[in-house]
Design a protein with these regions (language model features):
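The feature encodes the CheY-like receiver
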Residues: 81-84, 99, 111
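C-terminal output helix
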Residues: 4-7, 131-141, 148, 152
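Short amphipathic alpha-helix used as the core "switch/output" element in two-component signaling
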Residues: 64, 86-99
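Alpha4 helix (beta4-alpha4-beta5 surface) of REC/receiver domains from two-component response regulators
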Residues: 42, 86-87, 110-125, 138
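Two-component/phosphorelay signaling modules centered on CheY-like receiver
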Residues: 35-54, 121
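C-terminal catalytic ATP-binding subdomain
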Residues: 1-17
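Active-site beta3 strand of CheY-like receiver
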Residues: 69-75, 80
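Acidic catalytic/metal-coordinating carboxylates
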Residues: 36, 58-61, 84-90
Length: 159
């Protein structure tokens, strides 16, 4: 019998952590070139009715989509064709249109120096592959909640 990517024990992590007053649809941009990783994240996010997933297959396209769509959070691979994830993060952080968006690294580069380099570059969090479902979903919730509270402050009328 084939094993599924997500065990039954882990599926509780996929339930949205929202209440009735916070039921708005959130947008996550995933920048990834590997089809297997795309499929896994699409499957995980597909179980969350509160998250809409946008996909870019390289860093340049990710930057374009981020500027045009203003996602609530971005999930980014490091090893991308063309502009890598760290370079893309730098471009997003330098642009006033996208600087506020939390960017989470999701990378196979799992050595401590890789993680330190990513966090130093400005990633909100640095997750490693293979994906640990509970950690992945908790981190997405943190990033999406940060985005919601930040946009609420930015959009709030001044007293």
């Amino acid at each position: 019998e084939p094993q599924t990517a997500v065990s039954a024990v882990e599926t509780s992590a996929l339930a949205p952590k929202t209440n009735d007053t916070d039921a708005r649809l959130r947008t996550l941009l995933y920048v990834e070139d590997n089809p297997a990783n795309l499929m896994l994240v699409e499957d995980l996010i597909g179980r969350r009715a509160d998250i809409q997933l946008l996909i870019a297959r390289d860093g340049s396209r990710g930057i374009e989509i981020a500027r045009a769509s203003q996602p609530d959070a971005i999930l980014m691979d490091i090893n991308l064709p063309g502009i890598n994830g760290i370079e893309a993060l730098g471009i997003l952080a330098a642009d006033p249109v996208t600087a506020h968006i939390p960017v989470v690294a999701l990378s196979a580069n799992a050595m401590p120096r890789d993680i330190e380099k990513g966090l130093h570059a400005g990633f909100f969090r640095y997750l490693t592959k293979p994906i640990k479902v509970n950690e992945f979903m908790d981190t997405l919730d943190l990033a999406l909640n940060l985005a919601t509270s930040t946009s609420a402050r930015v959009g709030a009328p001044k007293p």
